[in-house]
């Protein structure tokens, strides 16, 4: 079953948007080869992506993304000094140390294509992958993994944890980054199987 009579048009628009984002430097560099591979497949195209990140964020209260402020954001492993530098910028609200796994949204031409992509992603370690949206206009697969950390570090300019604790959470976060970067490599190595 073909969900979108407009698949080719939607793919063309998504590729134009990606090209603009690439020129502006808005795409995580380490995920670009995977995006290019997915977009080279006849029945798929990417609509958005993040290669996973570690961040330090200040927000009035947890979940208030509208008024949140990045104090540090990295799409790679980080040093304790980088995290401490970000923490020093904290002034008000809650201070959070966060890890988020990679996330990709991929348009699929048919339900069978979407199922094949979800199964491949899960087999590569992206256990939270699913069909995110089905309508007569689009069919979107979300590729997502399990790595995540939400650690309260401080509030209203006061740091609640010591350096030893920070060192440990940075160590754990970096291990998660290594794990999800390996999953991205695995997915990139196996994505061509969808062309068969």
Swiss-Prot record:
Top class in the EC scheme: transferase
GO BP annotation list: tRNA methylation; wybutosine biosynthetic process
Reactions accelerated catalytically: 4-demethyl-7-[(3S)-3-amino-3-carboxypropyl]wyosine(37) in tRNA(Phe) + S-adenosyl-L-methionine = 7-[(3S)-3-amino-3-carboxypropyl]wyosine(37) in tRNA(Phe) + S-adenosyl-L-homocysteine + H(+)
Gene3D superfamilies found in the cross-reference section: tRNA wybutosine-synthesizing-like (3.30.1960.10)
Family: Belongs to the TYW3 family.
InterPro entries: Taw3, tRNA_yW-synthesising, tRNA_yW-synthesising-like_sf
Aminoacyl-tRNA synthetase listed as a keyword: no
Alphabetical UniProt keywords: Methyltransferase, S-adenosyl-L-methionine, Transferase, tRNA processing
Name of the protein in its database record: tRNA(Phe) 7-((3-amino-3-carboxypropyl)-4-demethylwyosine(37)-N(4))-methyltransferase 1
Family annotation (PANTHER family): TRNA WYBUTOSINE-SYNTHESIZING PROTEIN 3
Signal peptide: none
4Fe-4S keyword on record: no
A single GO molecular function term of this UniProt record: tRNA methyltransferase activity
EC number(s) recorded for this UniProt protein: 2.1.1.282
Function summary: S-adenosyl-L-methionine-dependent methyltransferase that acts as a component of the wyosine derivatives biosynthesis pathway.
């Amino acid at each position: 079953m073909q969900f979108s009579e407009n698949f080719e048009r939607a793919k063309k628009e998504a590729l134009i948007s990606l090209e603009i984002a690439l020129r502006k430097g808005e795409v995580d560099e380490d995920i670009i080869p995977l995006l290019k591979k997915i977009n080279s497949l006849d029945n798929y195209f990417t609509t958005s992506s993040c290669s996973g990140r570690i961040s330090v964020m200040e927000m009035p209260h947890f979940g208030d993304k509208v008024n949140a402020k990045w104090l540090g954001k990295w799409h790679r492993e980080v040093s304790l000094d980088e995290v401490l530098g970000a923490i020093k910028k904290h002034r008000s609200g809650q201070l959070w140390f966060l890890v988020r796994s990679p996330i990709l949204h991929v348009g699929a031409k048919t339900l069978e294509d979407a199922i094949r992509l979800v199964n491949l992603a899960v087999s590569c370690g992206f256990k939270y992958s699913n069909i995110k949206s089905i309508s007569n206009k689009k069919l979107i697969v979300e590729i997502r993994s399990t790595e995540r950390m939400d650690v309260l570090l401080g509030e209203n300019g006061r740091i609640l944890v010591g350096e030893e604790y920070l060192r440990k959470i940075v160590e754990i976060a970096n291990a998660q980054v290594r794990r999800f970067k390996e999953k991205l490599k695995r997915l990139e190595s196996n994505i061509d199987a969808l062309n068969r």
